[in-house]
Amino acid sequence: MIYDFRKKSKFGYTTGSCAAAGAYSALYYLKFGKKLSYVEIENLNGDKLIIPIEKIEKCGNKAKAVVIKDAGGDIDITNGIEIITEVELKKGKKDVIIKGGEGVGIVTKNGLQVKKGEPAINPKPREMIRNNLLKLLNDDEVVEVTISIPKGKELAKKTLNPKLGIVGGLSILGTTGIVRPMSNEAYMNSLAPQIDVALANGYKRLIFVPGNIGTKYAKQLLNANDDEIIEVSNFWGFMLDKAKEKGVEEILIFGHAGKIIKLAGGIYNTHSKVADCRNEILAAYSSLFIDDKEAIKKILYSNTTEEVIKILEEKGVLNDVFNFIAKRVVERLSERWKGIKFSCIIINMKGEVLGSYIWNKK
C-alpha cells in the first residue's frame, strides 16, 4: 500500500519514519548532490511511505535533514516537532550505524526493547532506517546516522519516559511507521513497557492505576515503588492483555472511584468518549443496600462521583457499596483474564479508602 503524506491525511507517520526519511534524503544529497523535497521509503510490511522533507543542508563531509512529525488524525505530544538526522559517509564494509543525539533519551533501566545505556531508538525503527539506507550504499561504504530532537528533552518530561528510566529526551518509536487515526496506538505502546520494567526489576505483584491520583496514593498508602506502579490511563483492556501475555501473576487495581467503577460494569476503555455509565453502575449497586427510590434517583442524576459518595455516606452504606463494587471488579477481571490473581482498592480524591476486595481463589 502507498501512503502519500505530501497531502493532508487522516494517517500520520511515526518518529521512526521521520528519522528514516530524513536519513535517506540526507544520504542521497551527500552521495548525489540533489536535494529531495520528499522521499519514498519502505516500512517493514512492504508499504511505501512518501514523506516530505522540510530542509536539507550540507556541513563539510556531513549532510543534515529536517522532517516535521505529522501525527495525522491521532494528535500526540510529538505532532509538529522537528526530527533531525545527520549522516556521515565513511569507507568500510557496507553498514549503517545509528546513534542518538540531542533530545533522544538514554535507557537507564532493564526490561525495555533497547539495552541499558543505549539511545532510546527502538528495534523496528532501527531496522527500517537500516533497510532503506542500505539501498543507497556501495559495498565499501559505511553511513553513520545521528538522530536529534531539538525539543525532545523538554517534551519528554510530559511523557512516561522518566518513569520508564529513559532520561534526557524522547524515544524513536514505530512498528509499522504509520500512525493510524484515533487509534491511540503510539500512546498505548508507550504504556506497555512499564510492565517489562517492573518484571525486569523483580516485582511479582503489579499495581495498576488510572493515572496521577492513583500513583500518588499508591506511594503514600501502600509504600509502593515507581517501578511496580503501572499507569494504564484509560486503556485497561489493552494493558491487562499485555500483562497476561507477559505472564504477570498478580495485579492490584488501585485508584479513584470515578475510573474504577467502570470496570465493575465491564468497561475496559474508560474514556468518557467511549463509555461512561458511572451513575448507572453506582445506582445499580447502591440499590442493593438502599431501599429509597429518591436516593437512587439522586445518584442517577448526580454530576460527580463525589456527590454520590456524600449520598452514600448519609445513608450509612458507603463502604458496603464500594466493597461490593471492588468485589465485582475482581470477579469481572478474573473471569476475563484467567490465571491472574486480582485485588481491588477504591479511593476518593483525598486518598481515603472507600472499598476493597481481595479474592483468594486460586
UniProtKB/Swiss-Prot annotation:
Enzyme Commission number(s) from the entry: 2.1.1.195
GO MF terms held by the record: cobalt-precorrin-5B C1-methyltransferase activity
Keywords: Cobalamin biosynthesis, Methyltransferase, S-adenosyl-L-methionine, Transferase
Gene3D superfamilies xrefs: CbiD-like
Gene Ontology biological process terms, A to Z: anaerobic cobalamin biosynthetic process; methylation
Catalytic activity: Co-precorrin-5B + S-adenosyl-L-methionine = Co-precorrin-6A + S-adenosyl-L-homocysteine
Entry keyword annotation includes Methyltransferase: yes
Pathway listed: Cofactor biosynthesis; adenosylcobalamin biosynthesis; cob(II)yrinate a,c-diamide from sirohydrochlorin (anaerobic route): step 6/10
PANTHER family the UniProt entry points to: COBALT-PRECORRIN-5B C(1)-METHYLTRANSFERASE (PTHR35863:SF1)
Family membership: Belongs to the CbiD family.
NCBIfam families, per database record: cbiD
Protein's name in the database: Cobalt-precorrin-5B C(1)-methyltransferase
Organism: Methanocaldococcus jannaschii (strain ATCC 43067 / DSM 2661 / JAL-1 / JCM 10045 / NBRC 100440) (Methanococcus jannaschii)
Lineage: Archaea, Methanobacteriati, Methanobacteriota, Methanomada group, Methanococci
